[in-house]
């Protein structure tokens, strides 16, 4: 697993590739500033999401099948590239959809982003349907230091889309947490969020660089540096590790 953080949340991703080559993901969201009773160090709001976003999507009215992961990279953001097959009529179209996922936390806000890009790699148009999808968990008013909390997940797009050969369909999933009397996070400027995360990663990468003859040691230090720098939260008493 790996953990990533912004100033208002952390996300723990338990992920892997099964024997058939499919990607699996389980997310645990932690909101350090949404305090639970009794108000001790680890008494923060936590919520796990074990849901497959690709399983919600249909291509030609049927579920995507036979995922094959081709590449996984992590540089402070997790990127997964894979292909899916689908059924068209009575025939299976192998590797007809290429999917790219990018996963990262917001730098400043209490939400976590998952970007999805679907590309039609075949020579015929395909019809893709994305459902209206939203999940809301609420806590009792008596359980939180600041009252009731809400943890929510939603998709940025819904509807039916026809992809011509080579075209892409892009959308994102947003996972957020808030006090019940605050406005919900219904959308995000996803380009700005990714840009802010990249800017931080570049700053950390260019500072306090360890250079030794051992590239593995250098990489281990670089990842440890990211983790140490990002896990600083914006508390009511100021920034705190």
Task: Locate each region found by the language model.
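Terminal accessory carbohydrate-recognition/targeting modules of carbohydrate-active enzymes
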Residues: 1-219
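Extended glycan-interaction surfaces of carbohydrate-active proteins
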Residues: 211-241
